Amino acid sequence: MTPILFVDRDGTLITEPADYQIDAYEKLRFVDHVIPAMLKLRDAGYQFVIVSNQDGLGSESFPRASFDGPNNLMLQIFASQGIEFREVLIDCSWPSDNAPTRKPGVGLMVPYLQDRTIDWARSAMVGDRITDIQFAQNLNIRGFQLRTDEFGGEWDWPGIAHELADAPRRAVVQRNTKETRIRVELDLDRVAEPKTATGLPFFDHMLEQIGKHGGFALDIRAEGDLHIDEHHTIEDTGLALGQALREALGDKRGIGRYGFDPESSPWQVAGDTAQHGFTLPMDETIASAALDFSGRPYFVFDGQFKRDRLGDMPTELVPHFFRSICDASGVNLHLTVRGENDHHKVEACFKALARALRQAIRREGSALPTTKGAL
């Protein structure tokens, strides 16, 4: 089955002039980022259909010839970039006509509503006006209103392409107790600078490593009883982050599942204690993380710290934080670190975890990575 992206024309594919009529070549301007976004959607299997209201098209005030030239040029430019439209549907009525073919009416959609090859669950409508969203509602499909100064809206073309083509794996977790208030938001399919605010600057710096080197958008906000100590804030942040990972991954279909180095990359410098994991050096320090999104939480830590604290973070809570992630996410994590500088050792642990996560959450198809039928 094929998903269809129904798109408005003026204000959506091309910018809309002040007189609302694109009846001259010099008025033709493309909306920002529309072509790369539509190419991404094309590659994701979408077909495109233009659905546009053109008030009084064919009348003396809006001759058909004035419309056809710029419209044909627009279609030629799209085609030259690899974007073809399945059909261009134009309603030429006036608003006062209340024609059933005029958006938000769906009179022009009858052949599509009868087409059983369309994947309606994935189909969507993009437009700049509220009537486009009402049109989508009448078709029972998702509607995206492009952000414009005149009509509002909250979407841009890159965001729409990400939403529809990537099927982003997102989660927002709010964990509230008498001791802490933790909010974790992540998007495993979008790269963005990490944002962290826990009241513990060193801990924030470590959390940033997870998003940065994990290759996903991460936003963590925490308010805790730091007047007592750091334990509850660090522990509950780990639990909330683990829960967010579990929710974002869903049934884990299509993921790599495991995060570790191949057999060709042994951790040779550790001597007899060598293990296989994602190996990461940091000056004199080397850390290894191997993980499995098995659904069975387990944590093994091999390492020691000489200092009691690093900044505002007790080193005894470093393994406890990782254990909390495992408990809430169902991850099996083996983490090993060797070195002299405790700052390097802790940071290497966070970075090694992040790189192992990056490998494990990577999409590699659609199959469930287990013979059990569930993870």
Curated annotation (Swiss-Prot):
Superkingdom assignment: Bacteria
Pathway connected to this protein: Amino-acid biosynthesis; L-histidine biosynthesis; L-histidine from 5-phospho-alpha-D-ribose 1-diphosphate: step 6/9; Amino-acid biosynthesis; L-histidine biosynthesis; L-histidine from 5-phospho-alpha-D-ribose 1-diphosphate: step 8/9
Q: What's its EC?
A: 3.1.3.15, 4.2.1.19
One GO BP on record is: L-histidine biosynthetic process
A GO cellular-component term linked to this record? cytoplasm
Using the UniProt annotation, give all residue ranges assigned to the region (Histidinol-phosphatase).
Answer: 1-168
Q: Which reaction does it catalyse?
A: D-erythro-1-(imidazol-4-yl)glycerol 3-phosphate = 3-(imidazol-4-yl)-2-oxopropyl phosphate + H2O; L-histidinol phosphate + H2O = L-histidinol + phosphate
Q: Which cofactors does this protein require?
A: Mg(2+)
Molecular-function GO term, any one? imidazoleglycerol-phosphate dehydratase activity
Record keywords: Amino-acid biosynthesis, Cytoplasm, Histidine biosynthesis, Hydrolase, Lyase, Magnesium, Metal-binding, Multifunctional enzyme
Q: Which positions does UniProt annotate for Mg(2+) binding? A: D8, D10, D128
Q: Where is this region: Imidazoleglycerol-phosphate dehydratase?
A: 169-375
| SUPFAM superfamilies in the cross-refs | HAD-like, Ribosomal protein S5 domain 2-like
> Matching PANTHER family, A to Z?
IMIDAZOLEGLYCEROL-PHOSPHATE DEHYDRATASE, IMIDAZOLEGLYCEROL-PHOSPHATE DEHYDRATASE HIS7
Q: Which NCBIfam families does the protein's record reference?
A: HAD-SF-IIIA, hisB_Nterm, Histidinol-ppas, PRK05446.1
Q: Which family does it belong to?
A: In the N-terminal section; belongs to the histidinol-phosphatase family.
Query: Mind telling me what this protein is named?
Result: Histidine biosynthesis bifunctional protein HisB
Where does this protein come from, organism-wise? Xanthomonas oryzae pv. oryzae (strain KACC10331 / KXO85)
